[in-house]
Amino acid sequence: MKPTIPGEVGEKGHEIEAIIDRVKLGDKQAYEMIIHQFERQMYTYCYYILKNHEETEDAVQEIFIRAYENLHRYSRQATFSAWLYKMAYHHMMNIKKRQGRWFELIHQFKEQHPKIEITPTPQESVIEELLTYLTPEERHILLLKAVEQYSFDEIGDIMGIKPATIRKKYERLRRKLLDYKRNKGGIVHGTFAKSN
């Protein structure tokens, strides 16, 4: 069962829709309430894709700017958060494409300018290790399913892929992670043990 997304169900859902209506009518300050409501979710999602705090902050800001500019296109066929995640997904894919083009230059820069390493917590290390083992598409699916707990239908809508395909991809990546951790002698978090 999908947990309650703040501002998306019952009275709160109507509240978000009312705020969106105010923004569409020109109340720019009302948009700050939308940002406040969804900023943390967007940051978490983007960070696990980009793995860099500064890039994540920039990406989140760009996503909210694009959402504001395209709010007139939002139709209530999906929840606002699903619409926002769809926008975030496409933005992350564009960033990853750009990063791919500049990978060699960045790699050279990092070799010339080593940074001070901060020791991550054991849990952060496991998450980081698992995410680096996955493709960008698999990371998106995993984060939307296991962290944000969207249904396969919602993930399919966000990513523009059939829900049945998302389910198969999720099962494959789940098995991939389980095999990886078994081979490494570790334990995989219970979230990956079963799909819903």
Where are these regions (language model features)?
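C-terminal edge and immediately downstream basic/flexible tail or linker adjoining helix-turn-helix-like DNA-binding
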Residues: 1-12, 22, 103, 157-160, ...
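Helix-turn-helix DNA-binding module
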Residues: 132-140, 148-165, 176-179
